[in-house]
Amino acid sequence: MPTINIYKWRLLNELKISETQLEDLLFNLKSEMKPIDQDHIEIEINNDRPDLLFVYGIIRSIKGLLKKELGEPRYSVKDTDYVFEIKEVPSRPYALAAVVEDIKFDDELLKELIQFQEKLHITVGRKRKKIAIGLHDLKKIDSKHIIYTTVNLDYKFIPLNSDKEMSVREILESTPQGKEYGNISLLDGKMPAIMQDDGQILSLPPVINSEKTRINSKTQSLFIDVTGTSLDTVIFTLDVIVTNLAEMGGKIGRIKVISPYVDNSPLLQHKSIKITAEYINKILGTNLNKNEIIEYLKMARFDVNDLGKEIEVIIPPYRNDILSQIDITEEVAITYGYNNLSPTPYKIEKIGSLSDRTKLIRVLRDLSVGGGFTEIFTFTLISESLLLGDFVKILNPITVDYNSVRNSLLPSILIFLSKNQHARMPIRVFEIGDVVIRNENTETGYSNKLNAAYAIMNSRVSFEELQAPLHEILNSLGINPIYKRDTNPLFIEGRTASIYANNKKIGIIGEINPNILEKIDIEYPIVMSEIYLDEIKDIL
């Protein structure tokens, strides 16, 4: 987890608390501190709280715990004359900016601001690959029209910590920042650049700023730019920075943005989550009334609307860790106090045993191996191009080959078979594993289901070659299956059946459609079946 070094007296004086109290309060924020020297402490911050990577973010949260301030802070935001024009930058397409004025720095606070910038680079920014931040002295910018564009490698400016003009190529090849970050956004001999409308470069993201706009302890106004590959992350990062600076008295300035995605920035976006007192009390084992819960949520620095049966919680723009009702419940637990949650003695009156689910898996595994099948284990993630129906898609996949969560075991097994066509035929395999399917009755709208799947691949194979051993396996479980003709785009029409038991559908079986096989470059015919083990468990 990230750590920050801060001047402890700022915290203690602002909050008017002792060092021991500070340690206890930080623990409530899932953070820990240890002394560095007489004036400084190191604080370990939880990964999901980038808003606490700056001293004033910590002060904001602790003021809530101490009830010195309740609800979301109100920040002064005014429109400015600055314009930020976004050109096409293929390697790093998103950029936003803001102005913060009336800031008072000292040497310690300036160090902590630069530390905040670098910690955001490492955590949220994934070492500047996802986002990069530029901090500029606003008074040193000569124009109110700033442009985000690309420049070629011969373009020159004076980089930070230098007194001579250098070309972009020289900066990438000779400076420490250029060597470490230069290749991140270099594309076709061009680099992203933020410049004045007269062509003077202010920043070369994600590498280095210009010496022209260097900040120091006398800086009173900042121009902040954030560039990146994810618009949502760029928006959030800028919101986190400006709200932290506003906590130290800064006035946020809104900038007009010329871009295809936003008209101005910062956006300071809010979202809301509705929750009930019953839900919170059920999770925490408490008996808090609605008014008490509202008070605890305000201590967590949330605004709250009483909707009668429900409570609407307004999530501040700097809290991207609040995703669902369970996160709201955790915030109530923090402000209520974990030490105030009474543990309930749990009496175990019988010895442990295997669950029905585990027993079924073990028996089915033995029967399947006895039926001549080899067990395989495939990835839960798969390409969306191989899935049918409703499925969960990953927001930030590393690769398109694993951008979705499977809703069936069959596509995963087909991928396995496509990579093993060189093996000796026939190939008879099975897999027992979880799939994720649509379920409107759950909080997320999806739920896990346990399935088993079987496949036979050979130079010649038929429906009956799998039906016979599968029938024996199901019979051995105490299931008397009935097969009814059905259709499914994965299988050949007329060679497909749904499997029923006790008037409940428990699976499907069929010969794979040749068009599907051709799509994934399989040269052999395949017959497959998928069994819904949760349905079987209910029958047994």
Curated annotation (Swiss-Prot):
Q: Which UniProt keywords apply?
A: Aminoacyl-tRNA synthetase, ATP-binding, Cytoplasm, Ligase, Magnesium, Metal-binding, Nucleotide-binding, Protein biosynthesis
One annotated GO molecular function is: ATP binding
Annotated residues for binding of Mg(2+)? D321, D327, E330, E331
Chemical reaction(s) catalysed:
tRNA(Phe) + L-phenylalanine + ATP = L-phenylalanyl-tRNA(Phe) + AMP + diphosphate + H(+)
Listed InterPro entries: aa-tRNA-synth_II/BPL/LPL, B3/B4_tRNA-bd, DNA-bd_dom_put_sf, Phe-tRNA-ligase_IIc_bsu, Phe-tRNA-synth_IIc_bsu_arc_euk, Phe-tRNA_synthase-like_B3/B4, Phe_tRNA_ligase_beta2_arc, PheRS_beta_core
Q: One matching Pfam family, short form?
A: B5
GO terms under cellular component: phenylalanine-tRNA ligase complex
Which first-to-last residue range defines the signal peptide?
Answer: none
Q: What is its EC number?
A: 6.1.1.20
**What start-end ranges are recorded for coiled-coil regions in this protein?**
none
Q: Where in the cell is it found?
A: Cytoplasm
HAMAP family in the cross-refs: Phe_tRNA_synth_beta2 (MF_00284)
The record's note on quaternary structure and interaction partners says: Tetramer of two alpha and two beta subunits.
What is the name of the protein in this document?
Answer: Phenylalanine--tRNA ligase beta subunit
Give the organism, scientific name: Sulfurisphaera tokodaii (strain DSM 16993 / JCM 10545 / NBRC 100140 / 7)
